[in-house]
Amino acid sequence: MDIAELLAFSVKNKASDLHLSSGLPPMIRVDGDVRRINIPALDHKQVQALVYDIMSDKQRRDFEEFLEVDFSFEIPGLARFRVNAFNQNRGSAAVFRTIPSQILTLDELGCPKIFRELIEQPQGLILVTGPTGSGKSTTLAAMVDHVNKNEFGHILTIEDPIEFVHASQKCLINQREVHRDTHGFEAALRSALREDPDYILVGELRDLETIRLALTAAETGHLVFGTLHTSSAAKTIDRIIDVFPAAEKSMVRSMLSESLRAVISQSLMKKTGGGRIAAHEIMVATPAIRNLIREDKVAQMYSSIQTGQATGMQTLDQCMLDLVKKGQVSKAQAWGYAKDKRLFE
């Protein structure tokens, strides 16, 4: 069985990921659960051959030197895949994340209308956060797609690797892949300010300089989209501030309070009847929220989000209560994610 057949099987079964691991049969993740494929275990040489088959010479060299490598590739007519190849105690291994070739719209994802209002603002910072596999890339792709279909501007993306590929519609789109088109997020963001963008998507706010440059870009008239692996709005603010040395924290709080537009923290939950659905905590940067950021009163944010529904805000619990009422998510499923467990007993 070649890699294309395995990936076609994976896509046909609506798997989010295909896992190859020496010494074990291939496995797929469907609706959050890992399941074995009914074929014999693969040894080290078989896994390596399957993965090497789709790598460029440079990717093979990087894999041999660094023992792991990230890249993306496409099977035309099937899907794109984000790949991480690595070594483990039994030999080679790889994970293929499926990136659908069709970009879902904000409506198809069931996103609240505040998402559209946020991305129609001329400048600022919009953060989409959540654990790995929570659908951040899918949400951001829908936002970029909305801009692309409705605005006349220049969208610049910096990704590692490129996931969803956007065709220019009303907007000019340039997508840059780290290690292929640029040496890193920081270098690409420095250049971005001289490339006349209106919208900048930063695949991941990984380090101090990338965060600093994203804040600067948001302050200087660009709408910047970024992701972090944080699970709530309050933790996101803390994470950004904590990256900076003590002497700069006050200045960064001030910059963030001015440039932030919203933090959307999402969790991907099992849907009643199969499939998955995103639940969102949404914090909009109202004057009250800006004040809390500036004055380092992050602990008070949750209650502001709870009472801010008129401005489009909601806690994860409020969102899940709505999903439970609609019959889209079970109480038991929501209970595992809830801050106030009593709501779902």
Residue ranges of model-derived segments:
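Short, flexible helix-loop junctions that flank or precede catalytic/ligand sites
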Residues: 1-345
